Amino acid sequence: MARVRTLADLRTEDEADEHTPLYNAETGSRDSDSTSSGGAAPRSMPIRFLELLFPHFSLKSVVLAISIVDWIFYIVTVCLDTELPLIPAANILVHFGANYPPLIKQGQVWRLLLPVFLHANFFHVFFNVFFQLRMGFTIERRYGLLKFTGLYFASAIYGNLLSATAFFCNSLKVGASTAGFGLIGIQICEMALTWHRMRHRDRMLTNMVSFVLLMVLLMFTLNGGSIDQMGHLGGLLCGFSIGMLYNKELNDKPVWYPWASAAAIGILLALPAACFPILYAVDRHCHRDLSYI
């Protein structure tokens, strides 16, 4: 399989010694531990392959645990009931917590989070898990477990909230791509913050655009063309905004950072402040599909 390159790969090439402010001291110490000339045992071939496919692969990673839970939820929902082979029935997805706005309006706010563990078919879960692992290990390593967990689930909540507000009637959404777009958002933020000192800007931009286009193409082909655009937008905005706040200690920040940081806080506050009143107070005049219940 051809290796899909991410922002982290190119930044590592640009700054091979990893003396970039985006790598914190804890990350640096792990790097030196893993590459020291001491008595560290050589890695096995399977681990090396996984690290090639998923940079900074680690068994002790929250993104790996989340991905395992994704597969468990998918297997359970398929075993309970299917509409077609390997496609969970819609009523099963609703009972497990799918993003179904009429029920969110009734107070079932957990439906803003649980859809991140549910998927519509085999290719849907495979694709989302692959790309969140492809990006997630590096991001988790850079920011740490707690910050990564906050980024991941906040992006999922913001994405599902914007989706539920925009597509209220006859809308049933599931998938980890809301959180996945949050990971893309923080990588775009990193690229923007370090753009002025990158040596290979054209290559960085080309690979990022190619990566996003490939992801969108696969979504349309493997998920039947049913794309939650607003969910992706919400996750992307959340990830980008959180990235601005996570990198406030970055050295040599662009001159526009104070305004961008203020805008990021504004987005994180304004989106729920606008969406919740619309979601709960505005009568959409649509009927709940009782076949889902």
Curated annotation (Swiss-Prot):
Domain of life: Eukaryota
Catalytic machinery residues: S177, H232
Pfam family for this entry, one: Rhomboid
EC nos: 3.4.21.105
Listed InterPro entries: Peptidase_S54_rhomboid-like (IPR002610), Peptidase_S54_rhomboid_dom (IPR022764), Rhomboid-like_sf (IPR035952)
Annotated spans, Disordered: 18-40
Top EC class for this record: hydrolase
Keyword hit for Nucleus: no
Any GO BP: proteolysis
Cell compartment(s), UniProt: Cytoplasmic vesicle, Secretory vesicle, Microneme membrane
GO cellular component, one term: cytoplasmic vesicle
Gene3D superfamilies linked to this entry: Rhomboid-like (1.20.1540.10)
Protease found in the keyword field: yes
Membrane topology recorded in Swiss-Prot or TrEMBL: Multi-pass membrane protein
Swiss-Prot/TrEMBL catalytic activity: Cleaves type-1 transmembrane domains using a catalytic dyad composed of serine and histidine that are contributed by different transmembrane domains
Keywords: Cytoplasmic vesicle, Hydrolase, Membrane, Protease, Serine protease, Transmembrane, Transmembrane helix
Annotated transmembrane regions: 62-82, 112-132, 148-168, 174-194, 217-237, 262-282
Function: Serine protease involved in intramembrane proteolysis and the subsequent release of polypeptides from their membrane anchors. Has no detectable activity towards MIC2.
Protein family (similarity comment): Belongs to the peptidase S54 family.
Protein name: Rhomboid-like protease 1
Source organism of this protein record: Toxoplasma gondii
